[in-house]
UniProtKB/Swiss-Prot annotation:
Residues 14-98 form the YcgL domain. Residues 97-110 have a biased composition (Polar residues). The gene is ycgL. It comes from the Bacteria. It comes from Salmonella typhi. SUPFAM superfamilies: YcgL-like (SSF160191). This is Protein YcgL. Residues 88-110 are annotated as: Disordered.
C-alpha cells in the first residue's frame, strides 16, 4: 500500500505590535514583529521618538479596532511593514457652538 502525505496548510495568523510615541501625544506605530522597525523609514522613527510598547494583538478574527480602520492596518502592515496612527483632529467647539446658535436663530426668525 502506498502512503500519501498531505501537506499541512498553516494559516499564518496576523498579529501586530503597537508602540506609543515618546514625542507625539496619541500617535501610535503598528509593526508586524516586536522591536522590528526595519521597514519603518528613518525619518519617521526620528519624528516618532523612542517607541514605548503599548500592546500586542491578533488582527485575525477581529471586526474592528478602536481608533484605526482594520483593513487599512492589515493592508499597510502587509505592503509596507508598518501603520502610523495619528491623533484625531482637534474638535473646534467654538465653530460647533456658533453653528448651532446660527441654526437656532434661523428657526426663531420663522
Amino acid at each position: 500500500m502506498r502512503q500519501v502525505t498531505i501537506p499541512l496548510i498553516q494559516s499564518k495568523s496576523m498579529f501586530c505590535v503597537i508602540y506609543r510615541s515618546s514625542k507625539r501625544d496619541q500617535t501610535y506605530l503598528y509593526v508586524e514583529k516586536k522591536d522590528d522597525f526595519s521597514r519603518v523609514p528613518d525619518a519617521l522613527m526620528k519624528g516618532f521618538g523612542q517607541p514605548q510598547l503599548a500592546m500586542m494583538l491578533p488582527l485575525d478574527g477581529r471586526k474592528k479596532l478602536v481608533n484605526a480602520e482594520l483593513e487599512k492596518v492589515k493592508q499597510a502592515l502587509s505592503e509596507q511593514g508598518y501603520y502610523l496612527q495619528l491623533p484625531p483632529p482637534p474638535e473646534d467647539l467654538l465653530k460647533q457652538h456658533l453653528s448651532s446658535v446660527g441654526q437656532n436663530t434661523s428657526h426663531a426668525d420663522r
